[in-house]
Amino acid sequence: MNDIKPAIMMVLVFTIICGGIYPAVVTGIAQAVFPKEATGSFITDRSGREIGSALIGQPFSDSKYFWPRPSATTDFGYNPAASGGSNSGPTNPDYLKTVANRVKALKDTGVSTGIPTDLVQASASGLDPHISPEAASVQIPRVAKARGMMEDKVRRLVSGHTEDRQFGIIGSPRVNVLALNLALDRLAP
C-alpha cells in the first residue's frame, strides 16, 4: 500500500493541474485577450440571435445565396462532430465520380467559365467556411439574377468581403460565405 500511495497522489495532483487549473487559466487568458474567438466566433443576425460561426461552414443551396465548399463530413453535411476529409485519393473512382457530379451541377446552374477547385473539392476538415474570391466570382451571375440585383453591386459586395492573407503572407485571399450571404440578405432579402 505504501508503494501505491505516491502514484495515486501523483495521478490526483496531475489531474487537478492538467484537468482543472491549466484549462481554467488558458480559458481565462483567451477570454481576456480574444473574447470573440474564445467563445466560437459566432455571427449574429440583426436581432442579435446567433446564427452561425465564422469558423464553421454552413450549407446553402438556394440560388440566391453563395454556395460554400462541399462538406466531407459524415452523417450530414457540415457536421462539426464528424470533422474530417474524405481521405479519398485523386484516382479513387468514387471520388472522381463525386467531383464530376459536382462539376455537372455547377454547369447546370450556368457556370461556364473555369470552375475553381474549392467549389468541387471538400477541405481537409470538411467544414471550411471560406471560398476563394474566384469561387465567389463564378457565382455572381446566378446570385445577382436570383435576387434581381446588378452584377456589379454583387461584385462590389464580394470584393468588400474578401479577406487578405493572414499576416500578409499565410494562406490565400478568401471570402467567408456566411458573412457574405448575411450581407446579401441585408441589401436585398
Swiss-Prot record:
Query: Record's superkingdom?
Result: Bacteria
Give compartment(s). Answer: Cell inner membrane
Give a yes or no for keyword Glycosyltransferase in this entry: no
**Transmembrane feature ranges:** 6-26
Asked if Cell membrane is a keyword of the record, the answer is yes
In terms of PANTHER family, this protein maps to: POTASSIUM-TRANSPORTING ATPASE C CHAIN (PTHR30042), POTASSIUM-TRANSPORTING ATPASE KDPC SUBUNIT (PTHR30042:SF2)
Q: What does this protein do?
A: Part of the high-affinity ATP-driven potassium transport (or Kdp) system, which catalyzes the hydrolysis of ATP coupled with the electrogenic transport of potassium into the cytoplasm. This subunit acts as a catalytic chaperone that increases the ATP-binding affinity of the ATP-hydrolyzing subunit KdpB by the formation of a transient KdpB/KdpC/ATP ternary complex.
Q: Which family does it belong to?
A: Belongs to the KdpC family.
Q: What is this protein called?
A: Potassium-transporting ATPase KdpC subunit
Species the sequence originates in: Geobacter metallireducens (strain ATCC 53774 / DSM 7210 / GS-15)
